[in-house]
UniProtKB/Swiss-Prot annotation:
Organism per entry: Vibrio atlanticus (strain LGP32) (Vibrio splendidus (strain Mel32))
Main location: cytoplasm
Pfam family, one: Pept_tRNA_hydro
GO molecular function, one term: tRNA binding
EC class name: hydrolase
GO biological process: protein quality control for misfolded or incompletely synthesized proteins; rescue of stalled ribosome
Stated name of the protein: Peptidyl-tRNA hydrolase
Stabilizes the basic form of H active site to accept a proton (site feature) positions: D96
Residues annotated as the enzyme's active site: H23
UniProtKB keywords: Cytoplasm, Hydrolase, RNA-binding, tRNA-binding
CDD domains according to UniProt: PTH
Length: 196
C-alpha cells in the first residue's frame, strides 16, 4: 500500500557557514531530491524557507528547508502545512540523528524529539502532534552530552561525510519506495543499508 506523504522537510540551520555541518544532514535529502527531479528550491518568505514541488508517482510532494534557525523549524512547517492543508501524518521530516552511526538511516512514524531542537519545535507548533514521519540520518555521537552542540555544528571528517552522503542517496531511493509501496517495504530497503 502506498504512503501519502505531501510534505518533505529537511532540517537545517541557514547560511553558508552551516551548509556542510552535521546538523544540516536533513536538508541534504531535500536538496538531492530536488536535484534528481531538476527542481530549483525558491526562497518563500511566507513559509520561512526554501520550497519546491515535485511529482512522485502522480502525487504532489512539497519540499521545504526552513531558513529559520533549527530551534524555530516548526514555524516554517506550520506555515506551509496550514496553507496547503497538510496534516501532521502527511509530513516527513529528515533530520540528523546522534543515536545512529554515520552511514545508517531509518524511517520512523511518530515518537518523541530525542533532544533534537528542530523536532521539538515542530511537535510544539503542530499542537503537540507527534504523528509525522521521520527520516533519521545517522551522524554518530561525540561520546559525551557536553560535546553535542559543538559536534552537530561541526563538519564530519571526509570518511564520515562520505558515509552520510551515501545514506542520503539511499534515502532518496528508499523514499520513492515508501511513496509507491508503503513504509514497511521502504524500511526493509533502507534499514538493511550500511555505507562503509
Amino acid at each position: 500500500m502506498s504512503q501519502q506523504i505531501k510534505l518533505l522537510v529537511g532540517l537545517a540551520n541557514p547560511g553558508p557557514e552551516y551548509a556542510k555541518t552535521r546538523h544540516n544532514a536533513g536538508a541534504w535529502v531535500v536538496e538531492e531530491l530536488a536535484r534528481v527531479h531538476n527542481v530549483t528550491l525558491k526562497n518563500e518568505p511566507k513559509f520561512f524557507g526554501l520550497t519546491g514541488r515535485i511529482m512522485v508517482h502522480g502525487e504532489d510532494l512539497r519540499l521545504l528547508i526552513p531558513t529559520t534557525f533549527m530551534n524555530l523549524s516548526g514555524k516554517a512547517v506550520a506555515a506551509l502545512a496550514k496553507f496547503y492543508q497538510i496534516k501532521p501524518e502527511e509530513i516527513m521530516v529528515a533530520h540528523d540523528e546522534l543515536d545512529l552511526p554515520p552511514g545508517i538511516g531509518k524511517f520512523k512514524k511518530g515518537g518523541g524529539h530525542g533532544g533534537h531542537n528542530g523536532l521539538k519545535d515542530i511537535i510544539s507548533k503542530q499542537g503537540n502532534n507527534k504523528e509525522f514521519y521521520r527520516l533519521r540520518l545517522g551522524i554518530g555521537h561525540p561520546g559525551h552530552k557536553d560535546k553535542v552542540a559543538g559536534y552537530v555544528l561541526g563538519k564530519a571528517p571526509a570518511k564520515e561525510q562520505e558515509c552520510i552522503e551515501a545514506v542520503v542517496d539511499e534515502s532518496v531511493r528508499s523514499l520513492d519506495i515508501l511513496l509507491k509501496d508503503g513504509l514497511p517495504k521502504a524500511q526493509n530497503r533502507l534499514h538493511t543499508f550500511k555505507a562503509e
